[in-house]
């Protein structure tokens, strides 16, 4: 889908660039596949702010997405492509031959009327799902599981994908968008193709209000605060903060490594931080 630019008849339209969604379905989502979504405003169950700068935004309903794709060898037809306010990718409504409806992540080049199927030996075409052990090396994939049966966790954002680059002792070797290479069990399912809406990275909101509509409030810099509010606060006139960057609670940030999950280090063959040769 193309990008839309606007004549600047208001200041907020001068820089505005959005994705043209005219080809998507205009109506409401399937009611049986949605539920209400209550606003948290960045608060936890005690009412305290645990994530700053969140709140407000347009009301949403949550669409249940089938990330597991375990309805094996049942052909489904794409009824329509829809917008989903809860993610950057578009979603596709699938009607299976037994009458069941489901939402899946829409890959690129998936069109209304196309047929998709999940199984152990199915064609390698966009929207089909199969175990990594059944895919040819070099396949572009998305919605990749990390644990068999848990549902896809990798490559779910707009325009993202992973590539199957090899196999080793029942494990699949994947190259991710970040440059990381990692091992994943060959029994894990993945869907073929790259995720839809690749132009998402080119949009320009044009005004602060569009972030507010999404529930994002103004992100205040620490150096603009008072000393009581942030370690970088205070000082006469503008200052640099006077120390290495820290969080409001004094922990180092901006480049400080935070990964502590040593248990899965052995599955990462090449770190995303490794210098490109």
Curated annotation (Swiss-Prot):
Stored PROSITE patterns: RIBOSOMAL_L2 (PS00467)
Region (Disordered): 222-277
GO CC annotation terms, alphabetical: large ribosomal subunit
Record-linked Pfam families: Ribosomal_L2 (PF00181), Ribosomal_L2_C (PF03947)
Record has rRNA-binding as a keyword: yes
Superkingdom field: Bacteria
One Gene Ontology term of the molecular function aspect: rRNA binding
InterPro entries tied to this protein: NA-bd_OB-fold, Rib_uL2_dom2, Ribosomal_uL2, Ribosomal_uL2_bac/org-type, Ribosomal_uL2_C, Ribosomal_uL2_CS, Ribosomal_uL2_dom3, Ribosomal_uL2_RNA-bd_dom
Keyword Ribosomal protein: yes
Record GO biological process: cytoplasmic translation
SUPFAM superfamilies the UniProt entry points to: Nucleic acid-binding proteins (SSF50249), Translation proteins SH3-like domain (SSF50104)
Entry keywords, A to Z: Ribonucleoprotein, Ribosomal protein, RNA-binding, rRNA-binding
Function: One of the primary rRNA binding proteins. Required for association of the 30S and 50S subunits to form the 70S ribosome, for tRNA binding and peptide bond formation. It has been suggested to have peptidyltransferase activity; this is somewhat controversial. Makes several contacts with the 16S rRNA in the 70S ribosome.
Subunit structure: Part of the 50S ribosomal subunit. Forms a bridge to the 30S subunit in the 70S ribosome.
Assigned protein family: Belongs to the universal ribosomal protein uL2 family.
Protein name, entry field: Large ribosomal subunit protein uL2
Gene that encodes the chain: rplB
